[in-house]
Amino acid sequence: MAKKATTDPLAPFSPEVRRWFEASFDGATPAQAEGWRAISEGSSTLICAPTGSGKTLASFLWGIDSLARRPDRPPGVKIVYVSPLKALSYDIERNLKAPLRGIGADISVALRTGDTPQSERAKMRRDPPDILITTPESLY
């Protein structure tokens, strides 16, 4: 049976994610709407859009929703975000806090860069986060 086409970019998301998004934003940006459509269809997706157009949320919300739907998921990293810049990594981590707090899901996030102390790296190995944000030089 074919999927029914919808113009609601939030249609594929869980009620919790929809409620959080609708309470937080006036609506999806074009980058988000097109990105979520492609991602929800299982397509590999590249989102090119200007600064401030919602790319971070476009790229993460589907993964956050998927993790939130599986509270019994096994431990381990499920999403890896490789940032070309350390400063951007910190921004990404900060920008994930609002949706994670608003949705209320138990999803852990860790940041690993060249500045991450060995003790924190060891903790990440023992208790891996659900989402790992890292830089190319730290991805090994």
What are these regions (language model features)?
Residues M1-K4:
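Short Lys/Arg-rich cationic patches that frequently serve as NLS/NoLS or arginine-rich RNA/DNA-binding motifs
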